[in-house]
Amino acid sequence: MFQVVLGAPQRLLKEGRQSRKLVLVVVFVALLLDNMLLTVVVPIVPTFLYATEFKDINSSLLRGPSVSSQQALTSPAFSTTFSFFDNTTMTVEEHVPFRVAWINGTIPPPVTEAGSVPKNNCLQGIEFLEEENVRIGILFASKALMQLLVNPFVGPLTNRIGYHIPMFVGFMIMFLSTLMFAFSGTYALLFVARTLQGIGSSFSSVAGLGMLASVYTDNYERGRAMGIALGGLALGLLVGAPFGSVMYEFVGKSSPFLILAFLALLDGALQFCILWPSKVSPESAMGTPLLTLLKDPYILVAAGSICLANMGVAILEPTLPIWMMQTMCSPEWQLGLAFLPASVAYLIGTNLFGVLANKMGRWLCSLVGMVAVGISLLCVPLAHNIFGLIGPNAGLGFAIGMVDSSLMPIMGYLVDLRHTSVYGSVYAIADVAFCVGFAIGPSTGGVIVPVIGFPWLMVIIGTINIIYAPLCCFLQNPPAKEEELAILNQECPTETQMYTIQRPTKEFPLGENSDDPGSEE
């Protein structure tokens, strides 16, 4: 009896290492953490840099007024200051970050009601905000740029050594990046933390998606598992920005990042318990070369759709909060909540179409999704307040959910159909496409907005999505590799063969004793 009790934890660990569902949980949590950290900085960084740097710029002016003026500013009669972001008044002693007093050397009239102040007061510091578009865009894009550089090495690496080690390396780097965000007080340190996040995200995303594709070999089950895993991505996008804005407003800058660091520790402990290094067979190291996959036109079409659809929301991350600050006089907490409809709709879209796309046709879902992305982006500049952003942002999130949940399984399907069923490289390509969108979007958006304005930027990226959408028709019936050769030699008709998995019974790649029979579930 005593031996049975002592052996129970070992038995549970052994069963857990052979469970596909726990692997799905690990990938879900990893994507959740990555995307919470991705979006939690969206409302924090613009306000934090404004509070620190713009305040420092104006502090030199504070020393300019005469002694009598300074005394008058501290007197009870003139102890109120106007916030040009949320049209509220407060005492100078109750100054919090992101509130800037009128310090031009003259005494402003007492403000008693927000409605009595002209609306153009919310445009104070507009030159600084326009300059911040570029710097914040580069900061946000640095994560995707670094991820873009690392992905081509991570994909083949997972084919060689398996998925456990890259997943755990990704966890450690993400944990370090989260701590750096918590305690960084300058733009340079924030930039380093963001680039570190890109490295960790590359390891976690490529290894996680490749792991799911290896474990779930059935096309229907794979689509469902990918939809659930992308739900973790969606949930991270859902709670990241609102969570960051609320915690920054009422607790402080470090608090959301410390909570995410604790979540990273939980994910690392879960990985350490249930994931073990793969027993890599010689055939698993003979996957299709990355360059060969990049020459496949069908993989390129799918990757282009992923890139352009996600570029739409990537452009909004640095530009929408600043546009709201300039045109809507929005307070800090609204800057994060503006992304809430998109995140909720993305969560619904990924889970709904992870199952429906297999019945409707994944190519059709991706085509409709890209058109919807374009239309939603065209409607964003029409909003005059945060309530006007609900519809366009919700449509954008739902449409991107359609595209991602449809095209991620297609990437694995194309490798099974046209190449060798080793998935590290193809999901590295998918992640590269995602990263290109999140690299080009914020960086170019931050540069273009001061030149042509935010509305025209939305028109351009929305139109590009609509124009690209018809290319998804090529994904309807992609030919198998043997069919392609036969078609070129005119030796067989062009009908598409029925899709069959090359290795229908694939051993669980992460089990400690993969030779032992047992249930996968």
From Swiss-Prot:
Catalytic activity: serotonin(in) + 2 H(+)(out) = serotonin(out) + 2 H(+)(in); (R)-noradrenaline(in) + 2 H(+)(out) = (R)-noradrenaline(out) + 2 H(+)(in); dopamine(in) + 2 H(+)(out) = dopamine(out) + 2 H(+)(in)
Keywords per UniProt: Cytoplasmic vesicle, Glycoprotein, Membrane, Neurotransmitter transport, Synapse, Transmembrane, Transmembrane helix, Transport
Coiled coil feature spans: none
TM region positions: 22-42, 136-155, 165-185, 195-215, 225-247, 254-276, 297-316, 333-357, 363-383, 395-415, 420-440, 446-467
UniProt xrefs under InterPro entries: MFS, MFS_dom, MFS_trans_sf, MFS_Vesicular_Transporter, Multidrug-R
PROSITE patterns: MFS (PS50850)
GO cellular component entries: synapse; synaptic vesicle membrane
Protein activity control: Inhibited by reserpine, and the proton ionophore carbonyl cyanide-p-trifluoromethoxyphenylhydrazone (FCCP).
PANTHER family: CHROMAFFIN GRANULE AMINE TRANSPORTER, GH10249P
General function of this protein: Electrogenic antiporter that exchanges one cationic monoamine with two intravesicular protons across the membrane of secretory and synaptic vesicles. Uses the electrochemical proton gradient established by the V-type proton-pump ATPase to accumulate high concentrations of monoamines inside the vesicles prior to their release via exocytosis. Transports catecholamines and indolamines with higher affinity for serotonin. Regulates the transvesicular monoaminergic gradient that determines the quantal size.
The protein's name in its UniProt record: Chromaffin granule amine transporter
Lineage: Eukaryota, Metazoa, Chordata, Craniata, Vertebrata
